[in-house]
């Protein structure tokens, strides 16, 4: 009986480790020429949920999302906005229905995200840490 419990514990721990390893390090980025420094998780969550439309210095902020099936998008929202995919969909449905706003523009993947953010000083997005190049500046690693 005890060996069965130990086996289950070992399997659970192995699965937890595998799941953690599968998650990449997501970072929040702006164009390298954007003057914004570090931002808090709450400030970024406000921008990505439409509750704020500007960077802390008052300049316009344009959030850009990866597509709804992106694992990076899921990780970003769980870590930053605290919403999973279903909660995010419900949130935006409510906001759209009430006329209070529209969800951020979506891009199809990391390459498009990198291009969109690096070419617009008002853009803010997220990528895996390994996908960052010199055209981008990391403002938060949640």
Model-derived features: positions:
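Exported/periplasmic ABC-transporter solute-binding proteins
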Residues: 25-142
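Short, linear, compositionally biased motifs with a strong N-terminal bias
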Residues: 15-16
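Bacterial N-terminal signal peptides that target proteins for export
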Residues: 1-11
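Sec/Tat signal peptide C-region and signal peptidase I cleavage site
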Residues: 19-24
């Amino acid at each position: 009986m005890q060996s069965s419990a130990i086996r289950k514990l070992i399997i659970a721990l192995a699965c937890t480790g595998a799941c953690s390893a599968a998650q990449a390090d997501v970072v929040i980025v702006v164009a390298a020429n954007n003057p914004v420094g570090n931002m808090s998780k709450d400030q970024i969550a406000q921008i990505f949920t439409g509750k704020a439309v500007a960077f802390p210095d008052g300049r316009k902020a344009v959030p850009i999302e990866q597509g709804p099936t992106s694992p990076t998008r899921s990780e970003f929202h769980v870590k930053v906005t605290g919403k999973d995919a279903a909660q995010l969909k419900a949130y935006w449905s409510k906001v759209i229905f009430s006329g209070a706003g529209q969800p951020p523009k979506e891009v199809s993947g990391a390459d498009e995200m990198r291009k969109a953010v690096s070419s617009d000083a008002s853009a803010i997005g997220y990528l895996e840490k390994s996908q960052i190049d010199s055209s981008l500046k990391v403002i938060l690693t949640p």
